[in-house]
C-alpha cells in the first residue's frame, strides 16, 4: 500500500469544452472549407482530364453532410474539414487532390478567378477516418459537398481551454476513498504502487512543461501542431492537466509516462483541424511505441458540436486508444458539445470536495462519470517547481485519464480495449453519492477501488 500526503489537500485534474472563450472552458477551432462537384480524376481526356459526373450523397450513409456548422459563431473564414466515406480507399487520395487542383486551375483560367486554395492537413486515423483540411473558396466547397466520395464538409472552428483560477487543492484523496472525505482522509491518497507503470498518457492540450521536477523525466515532447508555435507550454493548462495524470506529487498514476501533443496556442485557442491532427499523431505514435503496454489520451478541450472531431475520436478509440474528455463548463447539456458527446469516450463532469456537483459542470446523459474538478492544485509553468490551483471539468478529466492508466497497470488485459476499460471503470465507480445531480445525469464518481 502507498499513501501520499500533500500539504493541505489532494487534487485531481479535469478539462471541459466550449465554443466561445470562457475562463471555464478549453475550446479550439480553425475552419477549413472544401467542396467538389465532379467526382474522380480518371485520367487524360480531350482537355487532359476526364471527370465523372457526381451522384447525390446517399442520406442513408452513416456520416451526413454537416451544413449546420457553417453558421457557427467561431467558424474560421473559408477553412473546412473534409471527410471521405468509409468505402473510399486511401489509394484514391492523391488523384482526388489532383482533381481539386485541376478544378482550381480550370476555374482560374475560365473565370480569371484568383480564389483561395490551401491544403493544411491530411488525416488518416485507423480504417475509419480519412480526410483533409484547408482553406478553400466557397465555389470549391459547394463542389466538394456534391462529390459522391465525400461524407462530410464541416467548417473548421475555434475552441478554447476551459478553466477558472481558484484557491486551494484537494482531489486525489477523493478518488481513493469510498466515503465522503473527512478531517483524517482529506489529504490521504491510497493507491497501488504500480500506479500507471508501463502506460503512456498523451496530453492533447497546450503542451507540457516537461522539465518540471514533478514529472521526474517521464514527460517528453511529442508534437507541435499549430504553425508558428514552439515546443513550450506558454499557457499552463496542459502542464496542470499532466500533473494530475502522472505527477509525482499531484498525479493519480505516478509512474506513467507523459507525451505532450500541443494543439492549442498560448491564448488557449486552437482549431478543430489542428486537434484532429493531434489525435492522429497520438494514435500513430501509440502504435509505434513498443515499450508501453498501452496508451491513454486526455483531451480537456471542447466546443460546439463537431461531427469531424467526434469521428476522429471514435476512430482512435476503435483503434485501441482510451479517451478521457471534459464534459464542459457551461452548466448545460454535454450532448451539445464535442468531443463530450462521443459515446465511447469517457466524458467527465466535475465534483467538489464535499461531494456536490460543481456549479459550472455540464450535465446530461452524455456525462459518464464525475471526478474532482474544483480547486485543484497541480503543476504549472514558469519554473520547474511551479504549481497552480484551477477549477473546471478540464481538471476532472485528467483524474479519469490517470485512473485509466492506473487500472491498465494493475490489469494489462485491459490494454488496447478502451470500451471494455470504460465499462470496468464504471463498474467500480461510486454510485449515488453526489448531491445536486439532475435525473438525466449519471450519479457516478471516479474511484480507484483501493479500499
Curated annotation (Swiss-Prot):
The active site is at 205 (charge relay system), 237 (charge relay system), 394 (charge relay system). This is Subtilase-type proteinase psp3. It is an enzyme of class 3 (hydrolase). Belongs to the peptidase S8 family. CDD domains: Peptidases_S8_PCSK9_ProteinaseK_like. Its EC number is 3.4.21.-. GO terms for biological process: protein catabolic process in the vacuole; zymogen activation. Pfam families: Inhibitor_I9 (PF05922), Peptidase_S8 (PF00082). It comes from Schizosaccharomyces pombe (strain 972 / ATCC 24843). The gene is psp3. Keywords: Hydrolase, Protease, Serine protease, Signal. SUPFAM superfamilies: Subtilisin-like. Residues 169-451 form the Peptidase S8 domain.
